[in-house]
Regions:
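Single conserved hydrophobic/aromatic residue that forms the stacking wall/gate
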Residues: 1-12
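Structural motif marking the loop-to-transmembrane transition
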Residues: 4, 30, 34, 48-53, ...
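Alpha-helical transmembrane segments in multi-pass membrane proteins
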Residues: 13-17, 39, 43, 54-62, ...
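Short secondary-structure boundary micro-motifs
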Residues: 14, 26-29, 63-65, 105-106, ...
Length: 174
């Protein structure tokens, strides 16, 4: 039955986000997760409607207390954790997934890189805005909330840009 397989597919999409948030990959200067990669991947591979729905449901699961977020405790803490220092980044997942869905097969490699960079940037812009509001603008917000992750983000953007055209061909075929 197609509704059962669609339901299972929705579970797998959110599980991919959860798993990508929990696995730490050694990287310099800080370990990275593949969470932002998966957020962009969902937008590219599923389009904006299903990509946004998948990310939105993932965020809702975290808000409701499931331990889906990176560094969230085993029992989760729901809204309290969500409204902490990472809330802006988490909300940025929605804009990033949407913007990543705008990549298409006619885009040059440079355009794909540009679109994915803009999508990723929205995560950090919203994240830094919230972080600054939460901890104070007198702190080195960029040094805390973006600089340690720049190399990892460049790596993930390049990786996704290299496989994006194939992903879109598969999406269009299905």
């Amino acid at each position: 039955d197609s509704s059962t397989s669609r339901g299972l597919g929705d579970v797998y999409k959110r599980q991919a986000l959860t798993i990508s948030a929990k696995i730490k990959i050694p990287f310099y200067p800080v370990p990275m997760t593949m969470q932002t990669f998966v957020v962009l991947f969902l937008g590219v591979s599923l389009g904006y409607k299903i990509g946004l729905a998948s990310v939105g449901l993932y965020l809702l699961e975290g808000i409701l207390g499931l331990p889906v977020f990176s560094n969230s405790p085993e029992k989760g803490v729901g809204l309290i954790y969500f409204t902490g220092p990472t809330m802006g980044y988490l909300i940025g997942f929605l804009t990033a997934s949407y913007l990543a869905s705008k990549v298409n097969n006619r885009d040059s490699f440079l355009m794909v890189l540009t679109k994915l960079t803009i999508a990723t940037s929205t995560i950090y812009i919203l994240g830094l805005l919230w972080l600054g509001t939460l901890i104070g603008w007198d702190k080195p917000i960029f040094a805390f909330g973006a600089k340690p992750f720049l190399l990892a983000e460049i790596f993930k953007i390049m990786l996704l840009a290299l496989i994006t055209k194939k992903i879109i061909k598969i999406r269009n075929f299905i």
